[in-house]
């Protein structure tokens, strides 16, 4: 079994919980403290989603039996790892398309993460 699958799922689950909590805070109060808590929850969700993305890259690397999976922390590093073992991953190509589109959910997520 791929050890990265449960980590990716856990990060996404944490993100859902944080977003639900942030939505609740927004519904019940407009006080400054509640707004700050909501912002903190949403920023935490961005951290978890970015982390899920990195672990997903590692998951792909593990699936294709790349070497030094722990060093994969970007799409370029995944691509290098795949080239080193003469493999092509359609998942990589799909992610690359998303990153080329500045308005894709992945590009927007990573742009927000860089702002934090």
Language model feature labels by segment:
Residues 6, 35, 48, 83-86, ...:
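Short, flexible coil/linker segments at or flanking structured domains
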Residues 35-46, 80:
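Short, glycine/alanine-rich amphipathic alpha-helical segment
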């Amino acid at each position: 079994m791929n050890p990265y699958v449960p980590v990716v799922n856990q990060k996404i689950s944490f993100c859902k919980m944080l977003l639900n909590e942030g939505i609740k805070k927004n519904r019940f109060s407009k006080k400054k403290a509640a707004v700050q808590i909501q912002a903190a929850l949403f920023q935490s969700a961005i951290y978890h989603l970015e982390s899920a993305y990195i672990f997903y890259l590692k998951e792909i690397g593990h699936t294709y039996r790349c070497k030094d999976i722990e060093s994969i922390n970007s799409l370029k590093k995944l691509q290098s790892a795949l080239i080193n073992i003469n493999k092509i991953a359609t998942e990589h190509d799909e992610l690359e398309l998303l990153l080329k589109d500045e308005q894709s959910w992945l590009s927007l997520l990573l742009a927000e993460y860089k702002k934090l």
